[in-house]
A protein has these predicted regions:
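N-terminal export leaders
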Residues: 3-7
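Mature extracytoplasmic or organellar-lumen-exposed domains after removal of signal/transit peptides
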Residues: 26-385
């Protein structure tokens, strides 16, 4: 999880624009904000549905541990992540996900000190799970999250990921935790590991349900207030996209890993799913910009978009931003698995070149988004206190 807010306000360098400019469409800020709200609601619904499917598979694992039930639980974690990642474009403006009471810190905290939660190589008795003095409850695991340090992670996607895969000790693949870690009599504290996995998964589902309710239509909730914001809400939308582009994704998740070349700075290191994390975030940004979201059943939610709003002022700029965002998605999609092999080597190593291209595109798109905000009369992208 990103603790600091990164805000981008640089001038935009000129780039070539391919094709004819977008024809200006008649949309206003209110329409864009209303459609965004519908899009956020749908995306959180899908993230919740994916997590609920994972919860079902995890129940099957703890009830009947086997290679098959462990593989099925891992598969549902990977599938659910695809939908959650696209919601990260709704962060960084003090909305329900990450305001003072928001659950983001419980949902997606990283990097994680594995030994805070469970055993690791050389420390067979490490972690909360192996400390029988600590009662396993929802309240307790919330209190334990980040206690004593930001890497002391006890909740969320990455805690679940570690409990499903274990440490990633391979240079070519993900972690390989045995299903026997959940078999009483086969592994120490298997009963507590089962209870912990069940509890932490239930908390994730509850937190996602909280976000769905915050964006539910026709209720006295955050969405109702957001839809009254017009241009101020548009400002928040653009701030979320720009902050995710530059500070979080290009910065914390890619530049840091490139600089250290350390597996510990990989976002989803246990499952080797980091390459998909990058794609999901870039896709989420594009979803918001285009006002388009493809749901798991194939249905497409389409409506008034930021692109159309900007095109009403400057069609060429709207096309420029669209092309840059599409380039970021394409560059992210070219990153190969495992990510921890992509980041190592010299400057001209193929993997490092692929990641650097993604970083460069994200940095440029954050600048372009700043220019797009300016043509709408938005010049202050810092989060209001």
């Amino acid at each position: 999880m990103q603790k600091r807010q990164f805000l981008q306000s640089a001038l935009v360098a000129s780039i070539a624009v391919y094709g004819l400019p977008t024809r200006a469409q008649t949309v206003d800020a209110a329409a864009v904000v209303r459609h965004y709200s519908a899009q956020v609601y749908a995306a959180y619904q899908d993230a919740l549905a994916g997590a609920t499917d994972m919860q079902t598979a995890i129940k099957a694992l703890v009830d009947t541990p086997s290679p098959q039930s462990l593989a099925a639980a891992r598969k549902t974690w990977l599938a659910a992540r695809e939908w959650y990642l696209q919601t990260e474009a709704f962060r960084f403006y003090g909305g329900p996900i990450d305001d003072d009471k928001g659950p983001e810190g419980r949902i997606n905290s990283w990097p994680m000190d594995e030994s805070y939660l469970d055993y690791v190589v050389g420390k067979p008795n490490a972690g909360v799970i192996n400390d029988r003095r600590v009662a396993i409850s929802t309240a307790n695991i919330i209190k334990l999250n980040e206690r004593g340090g930001e890497e002391n992670i006890s909740t969320g996607w990455h805690a679940i990921e570690f409990l499903l895969w274990g440490q990633d000790l391979s240079a070519t693949g993900p972690g390989d935790r045995s299903f026997e870690d959940y078999v009483v009599g086969k592994a120490a504290n298997a009963d507590r590991r089962r209870a912990y996995l069940t509890t932490v998964t239930g908390l994730l589902v509850a937190d996602l349900n909280y976000l769905v309710k915050a964006w539910q239509p026709g209720a006295k909730n955050y969405r109702a207030k957001f839809e009254q914001g017009d241009l101020e809400s548009v400002r928040k939308m653009i701030m979320g996209l720009g902050s995710l582009s530059r500070g979080e994704l290009a910065g914390e998740r890619l530049e840091v890993a490139m600089n250290t070349q350390d597996q510990e700075d990989e976002h989803s290191c246990f499952s080797d799913n980091t390459h998909r994390d990058v794609v999901g975030d870039t896709q989420g940004i594009e979803n918001v910009w285009l006002g388009r979201y493809k749901r798991p059943d194939g249905n497409v939610l389409q409506g008034a978009s930021l692109k159309a709003l900007v095109a009403g002022k400057n069609p060429s700029l709207a096309d420029k931003v669209s092309q840059q965002i599409a380039q970021s998605v394409a560059n992210a999609s070219a990153i190969q698995a495992p990510f921890d092999r992509e980041i190592v080597g010299s400057k001209d190593a193929p993997g490092r070149i692929r990641i650097q291209k993604t970083i460069d595109s994200l940095v440029q798109q954050s600048k372009d988004l700043t220019e797009a905000a300016a043509v709408l009369g938005i010049t202050k992208l810092a989060q209001a206190k």
